[in-house]
Amino acid sequence: MSDRAMSPALLFGFVAAYFGALLVVAWWTSRRAVEADFFVGGRSSHWALVAFGMVGTSLSGVTFISVPGAVGASGFGYLQIVIGHLLGYAVIAGVLLPLYYRLQLSSIYQSLATRFGPRSQRTGAGFFIASRTLGATARLYLVVRILHDMVLAPMGLPFWLTAAVILLMILLYTVEGGVKTIVWTDTLQTAGMLAGLLLCVAMLLAALDLTPAAAIARLAETGLSRVWGQDPMASGFWAKQLLAGAFIAIAMTGLDQEMMQKNISVRTLRGAQQNMLALALIMQVVVLLFLLLGGLLQLFALQHGLAARGDALFPAVVTGYLPAAVQLVFVLALISALFPSADGALTALTASTCIDLLDLQQRGDARSRKRIRRAVHLGFAALFMALVLVFRWIDDRSMIGLILKIAGYTYGPLLGLFAFGLLTRRAASDAAVPWIALAAPLLCGLVDFNQRALFGRYEIGLELLLLNGAITFALLWLASRPGDQGFAPNPGSMRTSAVARNEGSVATQTQTKKPR
């Protein structure tokens, strides 16, 4: 066991320096930002920058810990889901992005208002807010727990203080610039996460005295690199996983304000589509590297008789068996994986609440809008804090399974709503949509809870999302009548875009006229 553990105070110093660099980037990018830049970044982001930064947002600290930790139980089976993502990303690029750009939206749920009505917009936003709040705080909790155990607990500080410090860091660099800032900070942090991933793989290969080719051969011998599930009755069957992967990508990326707010900040539709396809390919390589890391951790655990499993394995190996420098790399990479998902969630939740629920862009003057937006931002930070403490109490062993389970219930109604709007021209009752969106997850829960009695050996896995979406679609069909409705440009969103451009123009003129 390593006796060269890095001092917690020194680790904290490096974390503080890293955060200082993020604050500098945040200050630089938000210097001339107008209020609309918080929501769509002035629609001037470069597609390559967004694609690279979205890798970090898509993965998060949960991927950094849970995906490698799950290799012992399911091998490389998670790759089935990620391969399925390719089809989902193609649907987003070919169907959803053209819709969002045609409607010129600040929030993607404004499209539901043009198709069904204002209650549907609020329902879509409400399910996104519930889903992203729970998912983001589950991700946040996992990383906060590890950072607390490694850095602040040895200094005698309580868990709640660790969570508060990290949330304060995120709040400070997102409160002004919003999307305009996080496009840049997420790029910086994704680079840090990937560098940390590669260094950890290299250090484990060295510790095991293996070349990459020899490591792959060893993983094949032990069965850890198995990908395809062959039992049709099991939840890990390959066809289920591929299909679930496609719909998870559509729902958790294409119908998610956090992920799409960066895409619709790109200058052109073509650029946004290039970003989505580039992201799809990069994700295949990055997840494969995480699975390789997980396989190496399992080999290391077998070699050293380690009892740690699941989410506890990676931190146990780093803190107990590898050189002190690797601890620093691990901590900085973990923070780099955490911040892009947490900062994007905080910004997107603020944006969706302000636009979809409060109709902020049609209210008062710019100063009052900014005051309300800041209050909402602070409110979500406080909610994040409370939920992190709840997850501390739950303390699930594998957070990625919990997050995907939550997504199956909360993204299903969104999937059904958008599918009905795109695939049919029927006129659904706007008043019925909120009730349908609530009924579908409840019916899914009944099926899930009684699946053994209903289906015998057949296990419902991630296809719960598809079932939820299908129930929503069917109920919408029953509550609709023949018609000729489609997604139409929203006059409100056009007016909002004009106001934003006007504010940006006024701000630019003011800066130009300022005396030297």
Report the location of each language-model feature.
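Long, low-complexity, intrinsically disordered segments
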Residues: N502-R516
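Membrane-embedded helix-loop-helix hairpins and adjacent transmembrane boundary segments
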Residues: S2-S493, S497-A498, K513-R516
